[in-house]
Amino acid sequence: MWNQFKTDEYQGMLAETVTMPGNQGDLIHAYLSRPLGKGLFPGIVLIPHAPGWDEFYRETSRRFSQHGYIAISPDIYCRFGHGAPEEMAAKARAAGGVPDDSVVGDCEGAMKYLRSMPFSNGKVGVIGTCSGGRHSFLAACRVEGINAAVDCWGGRVVALKQELTPAQPVAAIDYTEKLACPLLGLFGNDDRFPSPEQVNRHEEELKKYGKDYKFYRYDGAGHGFWYYHTEAYRPKQAMDAWNKVFEFFGEHLRS
């Protein structure tokens, strides 16, 4: 994954905030980054996590672009207002969460936005961490045309009936039969949200329907082990997971 470039080759990147059509045609903000130079590039939709549409997702978008992907992260919280990322995420939680239908619609809009670019190769993947991991799986099941999906420790994929809400009226696992693209799952064995037992249950459902998936579980890692700005960060496990993400997207979006 690292240092896969020649020291004399051109490298450049454009990163900016754009406006794109989201769910039901709503105009929403999104953070877009893309490589400059020759070539047609695959696209990736990054779905924000529970802490908000934050700096981590901007940095992660640029990391993907450094490796040759057009990356876009839609502001799924924008309908709750504008301000500091954590404030908007808190507003969403207080209101019962961002409705699944809204997030799925925003992801579909982001996918179409990427495909409309003249430098797109036409293939688009989706990835998210935490609640964004759950939404990544949902989008892969409900949005036609996604080519690959990564679920990073998405909680509430497995949910009891009493845990469902007006914003999340259907357990994500109940859409498994409709999954129409390869899925990569990354989980920490010390996590409780999702717990190893919930990951097992999700895997059982994927096997039941004969889906194309790979799950990796990391000992000594809990929720958010990618987050280098938190105490949850586990460098060894995080770097292995990053390598698996780039291998997975490389296989399904570049060929």
Model-inferred region functions:
Residues M1-S255:
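N-terminal cap/leader regions of alpha/beta-hydrolase-fold enzymes
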